[in-house]
């Protein structure tokens, strides 16, 4: 699919503060998309190649950039390049890297102060209660919309996709891009994730269509690795059911077998990631506690729904308009049965991986413990602005995660309670590592009982994602050939193959198996008639049939036709068959 993006270079987009921050999306900076001229010449393919995802927009400030950030981080916190041949480009709507302190000088608990210095994408939009992140998880969720057809229209400066107008590119990942999308029906901005199906399969090394969607447990309870297509459908099936203030919402999925992309529409969490790593301006302890409490409630909800996120990191924690965190990017998440997930594959961001997932001897490990480790690394990043284990070489990074002792920098000076919590979360032994219920009661988290977290019953409402829902997470319209075939069968009142010859066969209802079909006979021939009698009834005329015997036959795919004269005197009248009833073997 061709789309229109800003003509301004990526490196220049972070400079002017008022171009996008206060004036909304600059349409003057856009130019007509040259690729739109070729939309009419696109060939139609029945196979799917791309995906698009759309999320609900919270009008306000900032941009949700992490929806497309599925790139891993280096040990120093920088993102690893996906492809050396591709230039490092990231379309940002905000000017430069902004820490959360720069966004919220008034303290973490004040949502109004958090919005004072935020970057405004759409200042002219009115506040929409439907997009408010303050909605309770107990409230009935608006169901995710599944569109069976995608209509793409090329406009002068943008692309119209059903009711969505695609605007600037606000993020970029390894499998697609994230675009700002405006919904004409509800006057709301969303984040539309556009995924290329061909690129998903090509980068994963699949030469042809992968196995059916969904993750199936292997013997022993561990989860088998999934291909990228299966991961996308798993993410869709999971997100369709989740409804929590600290989890990003999936609004709509657009998919057409004749299109090359899948479109996922998410809510636009407008202030973007909680922080950039590394940063020279980490969060204060009060700010870190405020966001970490949100993270605990979100992870508890996911584990309650039997979901392991597997990629918790600051760039996947988005700040909403009320200043609270929403967990995003479920691309590598796993479902489990029972009390915990038993995992065997290694996915996620290298600097946030647990040591047991990197072990050469341990084959199966706990999924909940992986999320707790990543939460500990994230909390470390909150207060120190960097990861606890860093190295430019991936193998050295793995070695440090597995064997190097945890150390705390001298500055900034943090409380002993916080050091104790981080140390217990980054315990290299998953069996002795602290668990989420214990984290909720830790003195640093609750400020020694002054700020208790809600109970599990108050925070969680169980939803179930069945295997059938994973298989049917995105429904597709039937192809034109299938529609024509069904209409032909209805018109002929027959549900046999309408393109095969109308060869009639009689069936014996009492015969089993292959004996159900009896050899057809000509209606005008007796069942038992001497050969001499049949020869006497042979009409006069040239016998030009090379097939042997009278009548017509199919030899090597073509009919063998005889010239028929008048019946012989005294012979019974002959009723020729209307069509070939039986293919006779050639002599």
UniProtKB/Swiss-Prot annotation:
Modified residues (N-acetylserine): 2
Entry protein name: Calcium/calmodulin-dependent protein kinase kinase 2
InterPro entries referenced in this protein's UniProt entry, alphabetically: Kinase-like_dom_sf, Prot_kinase_dom, Protein_kinase_ATP_BS, Ser/Thr_kinase_AS
EC number in record: 2.7.11.17
One example GO MF annotation: calmodulin binding
Ranges annotated as biased composition (Polar residues): 1-11, 101-115
Keyword Flavoprotein: no
Keyword Transcription regulation assigned: no
CDD domains: STKc_CaMKK2
Cellular component annotations (GO), alphabetically ordered: cytosol; neuron projection; nucleoplasm
PANTHER family (alphabetical): CALCIUM/CALMODULIN-DEPENDENT PROTEIN KINASE KINASE-RELATED, CALCIUM_CALMODULIN-DEPENDENT PROTEIN KINASE KINASE 2
Region (Autoinhibitory domain): 471-476
Subunit structure: Interacts with calmodulin.
């Amino acid at each position: 699919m061709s789309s229109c993006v800003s003509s301004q270079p990526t490196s220049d987009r972070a400079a002017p503060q008022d171009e996008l921050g206060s004036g909304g999306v600059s349409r003057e900076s856009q130019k007509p998309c040259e690729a739109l001229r070729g939309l009419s010449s696109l060939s139609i393919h029945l196979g799917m190649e791309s995906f698009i995802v759309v999320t609900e927009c919270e009008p306000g400030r900032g941009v949700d950039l992490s929806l497309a950030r599925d790139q891993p981080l280096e040990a120093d916190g920088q993102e690893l390049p996906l492809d050396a041949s591709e230039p490092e480009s990231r379309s940002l709507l905000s000017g430069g890297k902004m820490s959360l302190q720069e966004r919220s000088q008034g303290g973490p608990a004040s949502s109004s102060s958090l919005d004072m210095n935020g970057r405004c994408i759409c200042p002219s939009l009115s506040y929409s209660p439907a997009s408010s992140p303050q909605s309770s998880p107990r409230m009935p969720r608006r169901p995710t919309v599944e569109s069976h057809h995608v209509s793409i229209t090329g406009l002068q400066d943008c692309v119209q996709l059903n009711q969505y107008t695609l605007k600037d590119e606000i993020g970029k990942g390894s499998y697609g891009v994230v675009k700002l999308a405006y919904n004409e029906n509800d006057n709301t901005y969303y984040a539309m994730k556009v995924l290329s199906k061909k690129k998903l399969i090509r980068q994963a090394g699949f030469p042809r269509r992968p196995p059916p969607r969904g993750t199936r447990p292997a013997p022993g309870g561990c989860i088998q690795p999934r291909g990228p297509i299966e991961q996308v459908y798993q993410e869709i099936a999971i997100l369709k059911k989740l409804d929590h203030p600290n989890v990003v919402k999936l609004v709509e999925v657009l998919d057409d077998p004749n299109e090359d992309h899948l479109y996922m529409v998410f809510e636009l969490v407008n202030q973007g990631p909680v922080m950039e790593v590394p940063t020279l301006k980490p969060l204060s302890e009060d700010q870190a506690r405020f966001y970490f409490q949100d993270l605990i409630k979100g992870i508890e909800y996911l584990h309650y729904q039997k979901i392991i996120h597997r990629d918790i990191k600051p760039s996947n924690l988005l700040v909403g308009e009320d200043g609270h965190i929403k967990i995003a990017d479920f691309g590598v998440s796993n479902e489990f049965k029972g009390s915990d997930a038993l995992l065997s594959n290694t996915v996620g961001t290298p600097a946030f991986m647990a040591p047991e997932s990197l072990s050469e001897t341990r084959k199966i490990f706990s999924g909940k413990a992986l999320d707790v480790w990543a939460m500990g690394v994230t909390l470390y990043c909150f207060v120190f602005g960097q990861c606890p284990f860093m190295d430019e070489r991936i193998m050295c990074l793995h070695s440090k995660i597995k064997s190097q002792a945890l150390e705390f920098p001298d500055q900034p000076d943090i409380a002993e309670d916080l050091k104790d919590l981080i140390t217990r979360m980054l315990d290299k032994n998953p069996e002795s590592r602290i668990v989420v219920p214990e984290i909720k009661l830790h003195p640093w988290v609750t400020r020694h009982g002054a700020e208790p977290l809600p109970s599990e019953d108050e925070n969680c409402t169980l939803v179930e994602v069945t295997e059938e829902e994973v298989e049917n997470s995105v429904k597709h319209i039937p192809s034109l050939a299938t529609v024509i075939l069904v209409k032909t069968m209805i018109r002929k009142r027959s549900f046999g193959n309408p393109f095969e010859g109308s060869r009639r066969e009689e069936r014996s209802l009492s015969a089993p198996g292959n004996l159900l079909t009896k050899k057809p006979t000509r209606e005008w021939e007796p069942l038992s008639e001497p050969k001499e009698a049949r020869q006497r009834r042979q009409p006069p005329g040239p016998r030009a049939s090379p097939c042997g015997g009278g009548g017509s036959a199919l030899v090597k795919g073509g009919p063998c036709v005889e010239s028929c004269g008048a019946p012989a005197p005294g012979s019974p009248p002959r009723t020729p068959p209307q069509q070939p009833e039986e293919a006779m073997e050639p002599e």
